Regions:
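Conserved glycine-rich cofactor-binding loop
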Residues: 9-10
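Conserved glycine-rich Rossmann-like NAD(P)H-binding loop of the short-chain dehydrogenase/reductase
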Residues: 23-38
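Residue(s) in the substrate-gating loop at a strand-loop-helix junction
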Residues: 126
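C-terminal helical subdomain
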Residues: 164, 180-215
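Substrate-binding pocket helix/loop in short-chain dehydrogenase/reductase
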Residues: 83-85, 89-94
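Rossmann-fold cofactor-recognition segment
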Residues: 43-57
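Active-site helix of classical SDR
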Residues: 108, 142
């Protein structure tokens, strides 16, 4: 099995690369950080591929030598919070949309044609898409786009299985900067285990940790006006 993973230089992506390699897959670990890629490349069964996921031509050039993949995991992403919605920062919004959503489109154009018939496409979104949360205007909008994109692809792709991943809080270098509590947060290693298990079963959606995501799913039955009142009361 040949598995390509974007955002493989840290967090969930790094753990996925290591674990799939340990299972015997040939892993193409992709990212921008050459030093971290070099470290990953020391593992057996891991090849590295350096590119910027927000640059279509960069992706195409870097992956030109690869003709097919059994599994592509689009995991690259970033998070920035809107601290002052009244003075909306469009540059911040553009950065987050570019990294989290537009990069998906670029990767799909470059990589989807190379996924073998019967292969798998895995797209990592976020459980933030279940409900609107404070300061998440940019991050939530970008991940909501990813979720809708994955669901539509699951309808239109007839020979590739699509798995949409909705993680809860995961302890990674990205979330280390969060200045608020992260209930039921799991390690990146545990998150990778959830994803690998769900992907192996070709689930349409993988969400975790289950208790946390099921609570969020249940809260969606509330009237929007009531949820907005609750959300306004959440601490920063």
């Amino acid at each position: 099995m040949i598995t390509l993973i974007t955002g493989a230089t840290s967090g969930i992506g790094e753990q996925l690369a290591i674990k799939y390699a340990e299972q015997g897959d040939t892993v193409i670990a992709c990212g921008r950080n050459t030093q971290k890629l070099a470290k990953l490349g020391k593992h057996n069964n891991i090849e590295t591929c350096q590119f910027d996921a927000t640059n279509l031509q960069d992706i195409k050039a870097a992956t030109l030598g690869y003709t097919q993949f059994d599994r592509v995991i689009l995991n690259a992403g970033n998070c920035e919070y809107v601290d002052d919605a009244r003075n909306f920062d469009s540059a911040l919004f553009e950065r987050v949309i570019n990294v989290n959503l537009l990069s998906m489109g670029y990767c799909l154009e470059a990589l989807l044609p190379k996924i073998v018939s019967g292969g798998q496409l895995v797209m990592v979104s976020s459980s933030v898409t279940y409900l609107p949360l404070p300061r998440s205007e940019a991050y939530g909008a970008s991940k909501a786009g990813v979720s809708y994109l994955a669901k539509s692809l699951a309808i239109d792709l007839t020979d590739v299985d699509v798995t949409l991943v909705h993680p809860g809080f995961v302890k990674t270098p990205l979330t280390d900067k969060n200045d608020f509590p992260m209930p039921m947060a799991v390690t990146a290693e545990k998150a990778a285990n959830y994803i690998i298990k769900g992907v192996a079963k070709r689930r349409k959606e993988v969400h975790f940790p289950y208790r946390f995501t099921l609570i969020l799913k249940a809260l969606r039955i509330l009237p929007l006006s009531l949820w907005l009142k609750i959300a306004k009361g959440l601490t920063r």
